[in-house]
């Protein structure tokens, strides 16, 4: 017999879906919201519902947005000749905070992983190919994570760019191998970004 009521168990299991949240942390969060902060719980539930219903992906770059086009793609101040390819919206947020990059982004939504059934189609690489064929992009900056999947993805994107004569650079590896960009401190990320180099695959 479970000590949790059905609704409390449902809340704990829901919180466990969050990255880095285990059973004990989920239980602490649930108990805090129900015992000490019911108003906060209602605000959280409302904000989550609005985000789930109203936030989608920018059709140009894939960044999370509630607008028809994200603010970066819509901005006339951004350099359209520079395109930084990243795995997630979290990577865009990290780079925007740590660097003075003024180009545009392309968010893949993951990395190539054949064992997990993630191929070029699942990452929207056909849309990236169309952007390259339009001829506006002069340099692609590869900012995928330094993992096996991230490197495979970088190699694939580099081959697409090379076919169209687009220069490809890779952010420097001040970022630890096996790490995720969103978890790297701003100083390290800024140094890695400024030290990017040509990428030959």
From Swiss-Prot:
Protein name: Recombination protein RecR
Residue span(s) of domain Toprim: 81-176
CDD domains found in the cross-reference section: TOPRIM_recR (cd01025)
Keywords: DNA damage, DNA recombination, DNA repair, Metal-binding, Zinc, Zinc-finger
UniProt-listed SMART domains: TOPRIM
Positions of C4-type zinc fingers: 58-73
InterPro entries, per database record: DNA_Rcmb_RecR, Rcmb_RecR, Rcmb_RecR_Znf, TOPRIM_dom, TOPRIM_RecR
GO biological process, one term: DNA recombination
Function summary: May play a role in DNA repair. It seems to be involved in an RecBC-independent recombinational process of DNA repair. It may act with RecF and RecO.
GO MF terms held by the record: DNA binding; zinc ion binding
Organism domain of life: Bacteria
Family: Belongs to the RecR family.
Organism: Halorhodospira halophila (strain DSM 244 / SL1) (Ectothiorhodospira halophila (strain DSM 244 / SL1))
